[in-house]
């Protein structure tokens, strides 16, 4: 193919492509323990609620209407109205439908937002600053400019019982005119880290002083799907862009993301949607609109989704500790999302090599090096000592995965 510079940029083999290929390969091989992907758990009680809503939408004719009509580029207007009212009532935000847009999943939103606020303009180049790594693998390759991202290594805090936690290193965080956007996730994929309210407020002050937006990726966060195990307050203001998703609610196939921002950003974003994809999908919006109107959404998250993931996180930690009784295993405190982040001190090999050994033994995880965007020129020793594992699988699979990991670690330690 004779590709343009744009085409060449996305013709490589990225970390997110590697992850999705391994997921597909693992699904095709019976017996492989799949602790590498990011697919949400299939929770029967949650699926039953979705089925009930779809039955109601089908009976009323709304399902066929949704599937047979385009929505506006900004998204389904009835859902935007419902969401705005929901956020006003729940959190007192000064927000209306003109502050919200829908998109084909959060990933497409990141592509638009990263390349709109950062990149080349007027002879200079601005970058997306990630103030704490490790961070989401999906940020790494969305830039049209390959040098779009820069990042700050986290401050590591050791906790009791073999846990540790990442915190923003504000003392060394520098924001100058080369930064066009600051981006964080809350909770963080891969580590399960949750930024405190005070950390969010301090990042907001820094972003406001630098006159750049603060983007908060809340794909796992509050108020929905609320896969977050710490008491936190949702954060938004006119200088903040919040990205949410219906995927981790249990609807990844609906490909629906939510962008909350000031009206100028939403107008621009909607224009980009019209140009690139005409309009966002409407099915996920219709389902969640009905859940909110019937006052089912928050109980679904608080009483079913969050307890499920918290119990699985606790179980996964317990199984790991039982299989690997070694103080050189450090586990990031699981505060949210659906992953455990493991740090192996003095391993002797990189977790990239460990990943290959585990793969041959029938266990799929993700090596840590993919989660450090903007750190390509930095010391990779910590990145290569960590890996991510998904804990949504059954107790039997988690236990078998822990045993395989323990066996391979014994050969390294």
Segments (PLM) and residue ranges:
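PLP-dependent enzyme catalytic core of the Aspartate aminotransferase-like
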Residues: 2, 81, 85, 89, ...
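N-terminal small-domain helix-loop-helix segment of the aminotransferase-like
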Residues: 9-105, 154, 161-172, 299, ...
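Short, solvent-exposed loop/turn segments at secondary-structure junctions
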Residues: 38-42, 107-108, 135-138, 187-190, ...
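Conserved core of the PLP fold type I
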Residues: 65-210, 215-236, 241
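Active-site PLP attachment segment
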Residues: 231-271, 279-283, 398-401
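Conserved glycine-rich beta-strand-loop-beta hairpin in the small C-terminal domain of fold type I
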Residues: 305-317, 329-344, 382
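Conserved C-terminal alpha-helix-loop-beta "cap" of PLP-dependent enzymes
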Residues: 328, 339-387, 400
